[in-house]
C-alpha cells in the first residue's frame, strides 16, 4: 500500500542513547510538533528505529517518548547468529516490564535477508537487516488490514519481498521468544512472517501486551481528543447537541 505521510531522519544511533542529545531532541520535537496540537489529524502513528538501541535503559527512554505521543515504536533486538545466543542475550537484557509505556514498543528478533551476497564484489556473506522497517510497512497498510488485526501469522504477518531470515526457528524456539516479549521473524513455507503481536509489557493488563489493542485505544483516544478540541468553548444548546449527535 501507499504511504501518504512519512518522515525520514538520518541520526547517529549512539546519540539516541543520550536523553539530551541533538538527535534525540530532534526526533522528540518532530513527534510533539504534530501531537501537541488542537488538531491531531496530521499526528504520527508509528516511530521506527531500526536496529538495537543498546540497552534496556535506552529502550525504556524511547518507550516513554512513544507512550507520551501515542505512537507505536518499532525497533529490533541485536543480530544473533543462533537461537541459544539470542535467548541468552535476551535474558541478560531484561527488556520486559510492567510499566504501561512498554505497551507502546514492539521489538523484532531474528534479522531478515536484505539481499544475497555478491560474488562479483567479493562478498563472503549474505546481507541480513533489522526487520522493524519491513514490519512497519506491513502495519501501515490499513487499506487491506484494519489496525485491530495484528500484522502477525501466515495470513497477516507475511512480509512482502522478504526471502528469508537468519535463523531457521523451531516451534518451541518461536514460543520461547514470544514469552520474552519480542516478535520473531519466521521463515516457513516459502515466506517470511512476523509471528507475534506482543509488546514488551508483561504486566497484569492483557490489553497492553498486544500492540494491536494499544493501537486501537491510542487511535480512539486521539479521535475523541480531536473531536472535543473541535467543539471546545461552544455554548451547549439543543442545536449544538443535535449537531454533535449527528456527527
Which residues does each PLM region occupy?
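A short acidic, often aromatic-flanked loop/helix-cap motif at beta-alpha or helix-coil junctions
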Residues: 13-17, 80-83
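Structured, hydrophobic secondary-structure cores that serve as assembly/anchoring elements
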Residues: 1, 39-58, 66-247
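Aromatic/hydrophobic pocket-lining residues that form π-stacking "cages" and hydrophobic walls in ligand
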Residues: 62
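Generic secondary-structure boundary signal with a strong preference for alpha-helix termini
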Residues: 13-14, 25, 29-30, 149, ...
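Phosphate/oxyanion-binding active-site loops and adjacent basic polyanion-contact surfaces
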Residues: 16-28, 241, 245
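Extended assembly-interface regions of large multimeric machines
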Residues: 1-16
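Structured alpha-helical segments in the cores of large, soluble enzyme domains
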Residues: 23-38, 55
